Design a protein with these regions (language model features):
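Transmembrane-helix boundary/entry motifs in multi-pass membrane transporters
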Residues: 15-27, 52-60, 73-118, 131-138, ...
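Transmembrane helix-loop boundary segments of multi-pass membrane transporters
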Residues: 45-52, 124-138, 158-167, 265-290, ...
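Helix-loop-helix connectors at the membrane interface of multi-pass transporters/channels
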Residues: 88-98, 122-142, 222-227, 233-244, ...
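Helix-loop-helix junctions that connect adjacent transmembrane segments
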Residues: 12-19, 138-144, 148, 156-158, ...
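Loop-to-transmembrane helix boundary motifs in multi-pass membrane proteins
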Residues: 20, 139-144, 237-245, 250-264, ...
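Transmembrane alpha-helical segments of multi-pass small-molecule transport proteins
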Residues: 29-35, 104-112, 131-156, 171-179, ...
Length: 398
């Protein structure tokens, strides 16, 4: 059965998944962390302050479990299609007939727009750091950041994996410094008042978005050559590290800032309670978080373009990054606006991903990664989680 499935998956391609380079477990894990960690993690404390602290813990546990299932299903979908990206998976599993190509390019357009909005938000946010540090015009900060961050992806997946690895280590160190400063200062009581169910829904949505690294899963599958154990380990560890960072940042902010938490972000609130030096450390964390997300998203988009067009990787890199810079320079919306729009699109595409996964699972007649946890009841749970996250992203917070 396994031999027959491999023949279907790798028809005329051979059994080995093709990739520009191989990733170590740490590098693959860091790509998952890098894609997930970002602006969302800094928004969680505000929403957590609007609910009892124990609600935050069970919401995080549910969001982590559903996201882990989703990521493993995506990994299996990609593995069943020889390490393909989302668009090619959709083309293989969902679309048939004369409208197949049209439907494929529509999906490509939606995913490209999602990445475009995401990366534009990273450029906008990072430029704000350069503007604050060096008093530069915003557009100059954007150009500087684009050149520095973009070159990492230009040199390929292996360099991205290495940079992600050391950036994740640096982020953990920065969070550790802030945590020690928080627990050695005057601490506030944790929130214990229930306000509204809508707040819990909004909190779930933000936590789910902060844990999401779905677009980077195919890179992991390709980077570890389809090794089942390495795929599962990298995804579980990557989402686990993101969950750990969310817990530390959230409780650190709740203890340090108390009920004075605002929508400005966790590090802004901490700087008010702990002192201005937190702003400097916070800027470093923000740059690292935004850069890891920039690398993961643009690497993914580069590969999607290359997969669909068969063009040179360097040209695909330019097509994946330059429009994001142009959109950021145009200033069509704010940093939060970019991220929110991209989040809604990304969550909605999750439903299509699960349908494609279900069809690929039936086609190959086996489940190398998810096993019984990939069966229909669990697929429905993941779809329900995606719907909840979508509703929570637009619901009013009280």
């Amino acid at each position: 059965m396994e031999t027959q499935s491999n023949e279907i998956i790798n028809e005329n391609k051979g059994n080995e998944i093709q990739s520009e380079s191989r990733l170590t477990i740490m590098e693959a894990t860091s790509i998952i962390v890098g894609h997930g960690v970002g602006a969302g993690i800094l928004a969680v404390p505000y929403l957590a302050s609007r609910a009892p602290w124990w609600d935050f813990l069970w919401i995080l546990a549910i969001a982590y479990s559903i996201n882990l299932l989703l990521h493993l299903m995506i990994a299996e979908l990609s593995l069943n299609n020889n390490g393909a990206q989302f668009v090619k998976c959709f083309e293989n599993e969902l679309f048939t007939g004369r409208f197949k190509k049209i439907a494929t390019w529509i999906v490509f357009a939606f995913l490209a727009f999602s990445v475009l909005c995401n990366v534009a938000s990273f450029i906008t946010g990072s430029a704000a750091v350069f503007t604050s540090w060096f008093n530069l015009p915003s557009w100059v900060g954007m150009l500087i950041y684009y050149v520095i961050a973009g070159l990492v992806v230009f040199f390929g997946m292996k360099i991205v994996g290495i940079c992600e690895k050391y950036s994740v280590i640096a982020m953990v160190i920065v969070i550790g410094i802030l945590f020690v400063a928080t627990v050695t200062s005057k601490m506030n009581a944790l929130p214990s008042t229930f306000i509204a169910a809508s707040n819990s829904m909004a909190l779930y949505s933000t936590v789910a978005f902060s844990l999401s690294a779905v677009m980077s899963v195919p890179q992991v599958v390709k980077g570890v050559a389809g090794d089942r154990k390495k795929i599962i380990s990298a995804i579980a560890a990557g989402t686990g590290i993101n969950a750990f960072l969310i817990v530390v940042v959230t409780f650190m902010t709740l203890l340090g800032a108390g009920q004075a938490i605002t929508k400005n972000g966790a590090l802004v609130d901490l700087s008010v309670s702990l002192g201005g030096w937190v702003s400097i450390v916070g800027y470093i964390f923000s740059l690292l978080a935004l850069s890891t997300s920039f690398w993961a998203n643009t690497l993914n988009m580069r590969d999607i373009i290359a997969e669909q067009t068969k063009w040179n990787l360097k040209l695909c890199w330019l097509l994946a990054t330059l429009p994001c810079l142009i959109l950021a320079l145009c200033g069509m919306t704010s940093f939060v606006g970019f991220a929110r729009l991209a989040g809604i699109i990304q969550v909605l595409t999750g439903i299509g991903i699960i349908i494609a996964y279900s069809r690929s699972r039936k086609r190959v007649n086996q489940s190398l990664i998810c096993g019984r946890f990939g069966q229909l009841p669990f697929q429905l749970i993941v779809i329900l989680g995606s719907i909840m996250a979508t509703v929570g992203s637009v619901i009013a917070v009280k």
